[in-house]
Amino acid sequence: MADDGANKANPGKQQAVEGSSNVPAASFDTDKLRQLIQQLEAQSLSRDPGASKLQREEAAEKVAVHEFWSTQPVPKSSEEVKDDGPLHPPLAPEQIPKDPYALPEGMEWCLIDIEVESEMKEFHDLLLNNYVEDADSMFRFNYSLEFLRWALLPPGFNKDWHVGVRSSSTKELIAFISGIPVDMMVRDKKIRMAEINFLCLHKDMRSQRMAPLLIKEVTRRVHLVGIFQAVYTAGRLLPKPVSTCRYFHRSLNPKKLMDTGFSQKLEGAQLAKTVSSLWLPTLSTTPGLRPMRKGDVGQVRKLLNRHLKTRYDVLPVFVTDAEIAHWFLPREGVVSTYVVDDAEAPGKLSDFISFYSLPSSVLKPVGGARGKGVVRKPQGVKPQPAYTSINAAYLFYYGTKTDYGVTLTEDEKQACGSQKKAKESVKNRENALIKSRLTELARDALILAKQAGFDVFNCLDMMDNS
């Protein structure tokens, strides 16, 4: 730990503190002293220009004051978690508020019925104009209606978890938050949870501390059905993440990405070299690769669950074929899934891979200045095509067989020296085979995405992606 390292590096430091008064050393609260040292070190690291952005953010998070999250059942940033277990024990029904939380005057709660076209359109427009955009306000997610139905209407969805806030006077939808039920495994424990998503506020509402109210209200509704754990993601560091991920972007249409400002602009030889290095063949190379069909659902479920369970400590569990059919059967403009027929076992699948479509709107033309709807092009700037969106594919789930039957010869076992090292050797060989297979599948996914007209292929450094 950082504090132990500091004391070992300067053993006289602690002695000087303990000997600086006549108070017996035993009366000092060593835990508080450690926390103070940790805070000082974190404060210093948060301002260190030599540290990475992630290191600075994590350090800043340790000393940040979160008025809302400090009241919630989440670990504190400085807290060391040693054991698995629920942060929030189940509540008795009489402990759960039956009525919604009070909203500021002029606002009212509502349910958004995703299956009603007019309400779906309201929700879509709220996201389109107010949801996630990059730090420079150049791009914003542009969800299709069909994508939102896919995301919010899985088997077992709860209409009460599609929570909106309207203006009491105009009835305009000004805020939204949603949840869907998910089954998760945390090591060897299966837990029913809520996955929270699409927290969105109208830009005019962001100074009124509405987000905590939305989170509390959807939490209340989740509690009412006996669920007391939830998972969610955030674009900023909040206390305390189970995991942090970084996006990686693989260009499929480098010229367009440069013209829109998504990628750094290159010219001449640099551009030609980049385009050449990103070249992809027109056909996939994995034998037996084809689009997923309805008849594949059962095998994909077994393949995916087995892959997740043998590779990761925290994972979703797909309990029914209906879930697999919903999330993975190909939907035009939403999700694409490909399976591989096993050449060694006719009728069986050896692998699958999927990606989903989420375009981004281009908010600012490169080289242009926006003002009252007029784009003024600076002198000497070559006009660029008026792109309105970037077509992005996102790597979704994948799975490959994990039972490769790797064995060691007697000579190899003796060379390992112990049973433990022999098992490690087998595991390393299996991992190498899985890595090679997944790399081949991912390359084919790039080829298929490019052929489908995507401009960029995105993925997070999670699962085996890293």
Predicted regions located by residue number:
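An N-terminus-focused feature that recognizes amino-terminal "leader" regions
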Residues: 2-294, 315-324, 425-432, 436-440, ...
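Conserved beta-hairpin
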Residues: 159-179, 322-366
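Aromatic/basic-lined ligand-recognition segments
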Residues: 162, 252-262, 273, 332-340, ...
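Conserved acetyl-CoA binding element of GNAT-fold acetyltransferases
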Residues: 176, 180, 191-203, 365-377, ...
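Membrane-interfacial loop- and helix-cap regions that link adjacent transmembrane helices
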Residues: 296-309, 349-352, 360-371, 378-387
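Beta-propeller domains
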Residues: 297-307, 312, 331-340, 344
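Generic hydrophobic alpha-helical scaffold/packing signal
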Residues: 304, 325-328, 335-337, 396, ...
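Active-site proximal loops enriched in glycine and acidic residues that flank catalytic Cys/His/Asp
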Residues: 342, 354-357, 397-399, 460-463
